[in-house]
């Protein structure tokens, strides 16, 4: 239940920024069973924001909340970072080009922040 509590905090905290994203993509409960209180679990955190500073503040808050939850519940935790990537905002000029093309096709233009970084990180380098 501690992880569920953390996940709810992460959702609220990310929403408070307006454009941050915090997700748990993996949740593993070794030897889990429907009638057993688990003694251990492993989970992933994915934190994204439009700037490194905003993401780092989100990370600090999430890890502080994790520590507080564990303290209150008499649990312990370890955290291991597996990947860190810089925020990769797309060029305003490229955004304008895409918006013009979409509008020229007679389609509505919608702006949204995408936390997806795979292609954006590479295009950001140009």
Give the ranges of each region predicted by the language model:
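Metal-dependent amide/peptide-bond hydrolase catalytic core
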Residues: 4-126
């Amino acid at each position: 239940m501690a992880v569920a509590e953390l996940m709810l905090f992460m959702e609220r905290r990310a929403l408070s920024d307006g454009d941050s994203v915090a997700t748990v993509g993996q949740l593993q409960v070794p030897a889990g069973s429907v009638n057993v209180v688990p003694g251990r679990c492993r989970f992933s955190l994915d934190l994204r924001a439009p700037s490194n500073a905003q993401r780092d503040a989100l990370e600090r808050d999430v890890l502080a909340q994790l520590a507080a939850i564990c303290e209150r519940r008499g649990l312990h935790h370890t955290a291991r970072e597996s990947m860190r990537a810089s925020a990769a905002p797309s060029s305003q000029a490229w955004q304008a080009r895409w918006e013009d093309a979409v509008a020229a096709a007679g389609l509505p233009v919608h702006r949204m922040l995408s936390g997806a970084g795979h292609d954006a990180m590479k295009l950001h380098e140009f």
